[in-house]
Regions:
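Metallo-beta-lactamase
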Residues: 188-192
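A helix-boundary/kink motif common to multi-pass secondary transporters
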Residues: 25, 96, 101, 168-169
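Transmembrane helix-boundary elements of multi-pass transport/secretion proteins
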Residues: 4-11, 19-89, 117, 121, ...
Length: 192
C-alpha cells in the first residue's frame, strides 16, 4: 500500500525530532559543532587578524565565509556518524519492520544535521559581529545569504548522510568527511 504525502511528512517529522533529541542528549555534539568554529573565529579574528595584511578591509570580513564553510563540514560529520550508528546498531532494521516511510529516516537525519549547521552558522556570525565583522548588506542581501547557507547546509548534510550509509563504522564515517572539514584551510579562505 502506498503511503500518502501527509504520512511521509509526519514520519519525517517524527524522525527529525528523534534525531534532534539525540543531539540534545549528547551535548558534546552541539558543543563541538559550535565551540570549535567559535574558537577558530576568535583565534583567526584576533590573533592572526592582527598580524595579517589584507589591504583596505578588515581580516575578519575575509575569514567569515571560510569559517562558516568549515563549520558546515564539521557539523555534517555528526549526521554521518549518527546514520552509521543507527545502521550498525540495527535501528534501521527495526525501522524497516515498522510502517514508516523509508525516506523519513534519511530526511530526519538530514533535517537535524541542517539545524545543527544553522546553529553553528549563527554562532559564527554573532561572534564575527562582536569581533568587528561589518557586512555592507541590506535585508534582501541577508535573506539571500541565509537561503544560500541553507542550501549549502542541506547539500553538505545530504553528502554526509550518504557517507554515513556507505560507511561500515562510526569512525569511518567521520573520516570520510574529514576533507569537508579541512578543505577551507587548503583554500584561500584563511590566507589572503
Amino acid at each position: 500500500m502506498k503511503k500518502s504525502n501527509v504520512n511521509i511528512f509526519f514520519d519525517a517529522w517524527v524522525m527529525f525530532k528523534r534525531c534532534f533529541i539525540i543531539s540534545l542528549r549528547n551535548p558534546e555534539t552541539l558543543l563541538t559543532a559550535t565551540l570549535i568554529p567559535f574558537f577558530l573565529m576568535v583565534l583567526f579574528g584576533t590573533v592572526f587578524g592582527s598580524i595579517s595584511d589584507v589591504g583596505d578591509f578588515n581580516y575578519i570580513d575575509f575569514i567569515v565565509p571560510g569559517i562558516i564553510l568549515q563549520s558546515i563540514g564539521q557539523a555534517s560529520q555528526y549526521s554521518a556518524m549518527n546514520v552509521t550508528s543507527d545502521m550498525t546498531k540495527g535501528i534501521i532494521d527495526r525501522f524497516r519492520c515498522m510502517s514508516i516511510s523509508k525516506s523519513a529516516v534519511l530526511i530526519g537525519h538530514t533535517g537535524a544535521g541542517v539545524i545543527r549547521g544553522l546553529i553553528s552558522n549563527a554562532v559564527i556570525i554573532i561572534t564575527a559581529l562582536i569581533l568587528g565583522f561589518r557586512p555592507q548588506a541590506g535585508f534582501i542581501d541577508w535573506l539571500l545569504a541565509v537561503l544560500f547557507l541553507l542550501l549549502i547546509n542541506i547539500t553538505v548534510t545530504l553528502i554526509a548522510v550518504l557517507c554515513g550509509m556507505i560507511s561500515k563504522s562510526v569512525e569511518g564515517a567521520s573520516g570520510l568527511l574529514f576533507p569537508l572539514f579541512i578543505l577551507p584551510f587548503m583554500s584561500s579562505g584563511f590566507a589572503p
